Amino acid sequence: MLYPQEFDVIVVGGGHAGTEAALAAARMGCRTLLLSHNIETLGQMSCNPSIGGIGKGHLVKEVDALGGAMALATDIGGIQFRILNSSKGPAVRATRAQADRILYKAAIRDMLENQPNLWLFQQAVDDLMVEGDRVVGAVTQVGVRFRSRTVVLTAGTFLDGKIHVGLNNYAAGRAGDPPAVSLSSRLKELQLPQGRLKTGTPPRLDGRSIDFSQCEEQPGDGMPGGVNEGVLPVFSFIGNAAMHPRQMPCWITHTNERTHDIIRSGFDRSPMFTGKIEGVGPRYCPSVEDKINRFADKESHQIFLEPEGLTTNEFYPNGISTSLPFDIQYELVRSMKGLENAHILRPGYAIEYDYFDPRSLKSSFETRQIQGLFFAGQINGTTGYEEAAAQGLFAGLNAALQCRGQEAWLPRRDEAYLGVLVDDLITKGVTEPYRMFTSRAEFRLQLREDNADMRLTEAGRAMGLVDDARWDAFSRKRDAVSRETERLKSTWVNPRIVTPEESERVLGKSIEREYNLFDLLRRPDVGYGKLMSLNEGRYASADVQPDVLGDLSASVVEQVEIAAKYAGYIDRQKDEVQRAAHFENLRLPAELDYMQVPALSFEVRQSLQKHRPETLGQASRMSGVTPAAISLLMVHLKKGGFRGFAPDVTDAKGEEASA
């Protein structure tokens, strides 16, 4: 049957990528259909019950700045919040939250069901409708055909998924869900470059069988015994601590030599070591057997016992992801302190799945081979909820822009971690599941969690992603930061007015000349609050107080203080960005035949011809493309007179002629 309604965007898959893609396209006014094999699993946290972390939290904040759902859902479902690297500089500080699986999923479902322009339909997709080199819709397993102008594919681990526990394996998309075998076969028919990856999950434990008195308690920030007691972190720029449910601690135990011996005794039945698993696993989230094998000299590994929610006894033992046989899982769990009598509710497993080489994507995440078909999430070779959500939003907004007949949007590497993520995938590809870290961003000083809204919300508003309520909150914050920064720069402190004792109390030493407040705030040990107490609050402003700005007050003060203290470093990084921008703005000709550039090595020519980077900047970051190769390519392009590369026109005196 051909469904009578036609859509602008069809999103296949309802995980973290799919939900953000569908919400983004619908917010932009496109008629959007979200197809999922099971509506009950929309927004499901398939692995660990947590959101955020180093690099990952930055992505969540950026998704939020563009109007996305993940941060708000985490504020509604978060049962523990922590600021990681809180003692370090603001560029590497990151928010991490434990989430109640049920509350998180319910929050996502609520947003989906109440989003205008968005329709849900429960059916697995078996086929894509393709006419010529363009996708025109999707076909479900019972033969319902939906026509659309674009399709966003966010299939997660479902494409030809296979679960492994010991030497036993079976087809599945995740535990309890069927795989997408037909869709995987169809994509292979389209001759898209494909490979296999794997990921894993630990056995889940019954909290009633855990002896927590033998474990170390780990309270969250704002909890009794935690950092900043009474002050709970918030993930969304429009969230607040009142949204959070009851907070819970995590617990810590450790593996030991006996645990390691038990794990080694199962190596001969491990699918990873016996060659049953072909896919490559995530380097930064290895299975426990991989850790014991690779780090044989380590006597123990930390294991975090994370609560799955407020209404369940289930715990997630973070650190023992495994595909070992169940009898080994049973023994290794019970060998650890506090877990001697632990009951396993669900066995751990590894899952293998298809992914497609992201180097075959355009910078909009549209496939090069099939027009209108976009990929996002684990299908692109990434791992993690946060990476998936960011890609989903990105693919969804670009599908919507294509439907509008507008140019694709891509933030630069100096504008967003999202830009770093996309650029890394389409230029370097993946050899293992890709995870975001702050170290992947060369301009991370200006890509902080705290300023994600300042970097992206205006762009989101221009595209139609940001609603009025978010825009109003952002505008108030932006204007307050600007006003307060200007006030500090124009307010002067005279040593004749401030006594040496008062100056020493606030500034650490007396001042000998006049300073403005902004310059005084640049001093390492002078905080905003302390500075405003100078001369009994003479220099404080009522405009940034909580009774005027409400929840925005703290973030405004934070922005002003960071701008002052890191001004020199930020200015230096802006200069670096300017120098790097030259290559980013040079677009490579679409018609260029790289095989006809004789100065380049055959390997470089082959790589450029196959992956066809869009800019010289992208080409410079491709694997195997050296700075020397880029110089030779520029010489070729200038000699050929290609647009943007032609030599400058000069007059007889050697000066640039005016147009």
Swiss-Prot record:
GO terms for molecular function: flavin adenine dinucleotide binding. Keywords: Cytoplasm, FAD, Flavoprotein, NAD, tRNA processing. The keyword Cytoplasm applies. FAD binds at residues 13-18. GO terms for cellular component: cytosol. Its cofactor is FAD. It is found in: Cytoplasm. One of its GO terms (biological process) is tRNA wobble uridine modification. InterPro entries: FAD/NAD-bd_sf, GIDA_C_N, MnmG, MnmG-rel, MnmG-rel_CS, MnmG_C, MnmG_C_subdom, MnmG_C_subdom_sf. NAD(+) binds at residues 281-295. Its main location: cytoplasm. Belongs to the MnmG family. NAD-binding protein involved in the addition of a carboxymethylaminomethyl (cmnm) group at the wobble position (U34) of certain tRNAs, forming tRNA-cmnm(5)s(2)U34. Homodimer. Heterotetramer of two MnmE and two MnmG subunits. This is tRNA uridine 5-carboxymethylaminomethyl modification enzyme MnmG. It comes from Delftia acidovorans (strain DSM 14801 / SPH-1). The lineage of its organism: Bacteria, Pseudomonadati, Pseudomonadota, Betaproteobacteria, Burkholderiales.
